[in-house]
């Protein structure tokens, strides 16, 4: 029999049992044994139906058509057969029953067995992952082989690669460069001498016909004056300075640095050697030499765009012919360019306007230089006077941000290039070695969930989505009016339908495709508060883009400053621990905003009308029943009696107080003090924070000792406030309340006689607080100030001087040693608190000694706003 149960189940058609089915053996053992026996005579085998996974065997009834004498009758016969259930490939749960007659397994309505379904799905998933793993390994092996071959080819090509070849120059560039050099030499050897004629024979116009005798003069008086000053300076230096051949050589060649021909030669040669298209600069240098623009043209080049550069070329050609007409032509060309280029955007049009102004200014300045015969150094000084103030702001800056027309920063350049340090690889060495930063706070860590975002493709654009519960959430403007959008997660693409649009919010909920069941689901934040927020979106190349900023709540939105990008709409806005706050919406290039997503924004299930009517009826009946059962139980009656007795006792005590002027009796606060004395002065402290608040404070950076001090200070503030709340309703007599024990009743009614006045007054003698070192700086005024007590004229008459000295000392301590509710650095807090406590005790003891109730025995006045200081304040 054992041999008959080894029929094929895994792999398909192999004749081997699946190991999971062999071990688990779900179902009826007898049905399992009978099923394998029937499988031997069946035309289709179980191994062909179920490729893997456990099977569930069970007996069941099956209705088959009755066949008599080869004729099918309309009556059905119920036979007992075997049902086999399992999970097929594709995670489909099916059930097959053995049908006698045809002797085959036929599919019937599934009979669900949870264990078989769960294990079967896991087996199918394991099989799929195992297949994917094998395929990935094959691909990895193939890629490694291809990489090895490519590496071999690369090494071979590197060995065969020739060395760096000398750069080849274009023939046109070489010819034009030679022409440029010849033009420079021709212009340099041109001799022009200015002089004054000495002949006395004049023609009819008053000018000499032929000048045989003349003397050289210089038309620029400033040049003569500066030359004389320079020569005098050199002569004086030569007489007092030590002789240096290098100094003489430098001073001899210094004038050549202000020569145009030398500057043009250096600039032209540099462009021919290094520039890809040197002809543009060579043309500019030739025209500048021809027209005598010279250094003015070279200084104007950085501020010219393409239209104004062409205008400069035309103007220089005209300047060589007629300077006055060239000035007029520069103005006309500038006006024409400004009119023809009105269709440009603001940025390009601004650059054109700057180029036109530079063109006209360069033409006018060149005319003045030519008219005055100014030397080259004069032009250089004038250009430096213009350029240096313009770039002073750039020189003092550490970096320069280059922005585009949309306001976004396109590029950031370092204003301190430090080329030698950069090329030496020593960047920021000394800063890293010697600069130490002081930690000013604790930066929170951020929890980022990888592979948790999907890409939403709609007709109106593209955005980001994420999963919350069994929905995909994104921004409403991403989906637009579409009802179906395409969703892409990693390499899986599917379609999702719009399920719900949140009213008054730009949020849309989509269906979750079956392929995305393993997508991580975000959890909602427990509370939405101002603080650090995190925006996670899909970046370029499939990487995650994470932005961290400080968020501020504005209504049902949260705004924050972050550098957003296109396609971020619909991204999740989370807390630092990954809890969802809202859905990212806005994109202005710098600021961002999100709509807060709450639990109430999910679609609420609609209740059937019958259920709603029943709930309303039940509520109505409960309301009516409450009226009938009012004060029907013994507890209710006892409560009513207690309230009535309490009311009568209050009236009686008020009457006794008004009639006899009896002083205050024992208050609840006094009773609590007496109880504490009987119990040894120990009082079990109550909890100030919940466990969740305590952990949150620890995460924010507070130590356990600091939290302990904060808790004790908060308990002291609670005790003071409770005393005020208990005493504020007393009218010359304490409010009646039940006694806590029989011992307290015996002590109040049958105790010892009342003490004498002297012994009673001695009981109220102030005591020095032994430990005040735990008092926080923000509680100094509340603990030691006299502003919270009622001070009578008699108090001022007898103790005014002591009170003034005490308050002046307290104000001086608060102003000198505290700042914004915190101790100032290097402050000896223990000595200050002991000093204040000693002065407080001295003042109260003086009042008690003179028969006046000290402030320790008086109650504080309630603050105007009726609120206490927050717990745990520092």
Curated annotation (Swiss-Prot):
Disulfide links within the chain: none
Enzyme class name: hydrolase
One Gene Ontology MF term: serine-type peptidase activity
Protein modification: Cleaved by the viral and host proteases. The protease is probably autocatalytically cleaved.
EC numbers, comma separated: 3.4.21.-
Catalytic activity of the protein: RNA(n) + a ribonucleoside 5'-triphosphate = RNA(n+1) + diphosphate
Site entry (Cleavage), positions: 195-196, 436-437, 662-663, 665-666, 752-753
Residues annotated as catalytic: 477, 506, 569
Superkingdom of source: Viruses
Gene3D superfamilies per the UniProt record, alphabetical: Trypsin-like serine proteases
Keyword Membrane in annotation: yes
GO cellular component entries: host cell membrane; membrane
TM regions (residue ranges): 249-269, 279-299, 324-344, 365-385
InterPro entries: Astro_1A (IPR045835), Peptidase_S1_PA (IPR009003), Peptidase_S1_PA_chymotrypsin (IPR043504)
Assigned keywords, A-Z: Covalent protein-RNA linkage, Host membrane, Hydrolase, Membrane, Phosphoprotein, Protease, Serine protease, Transmembrane, Transmembrane helix, Viral RNA replication
Pfam families cross-referenced by the UniProt entry: Astro_1A (PF19415), Trypsin_2 (PF13365)
SUPFAM superfamilies per the UniProt record, alphabetical: Trypsin-like serine proteases
Compositionally skewed regions (Basic residues) per UniProt: 857-874
Residues bearing the modification O-(5'-phospho-RNA)-tyrosine: 694
GO BP field: proteolysis; viral translational frameshifting
Residue segments, region Disordered: 855-874
Family: Belongs to the astroviridae polyprotein 1A family.
Protein name: Non-structural polyprotein 1A
Organism name: Mink astrovirus 1
Gene name, Swiss-Prot/TrEMBL: ORF1
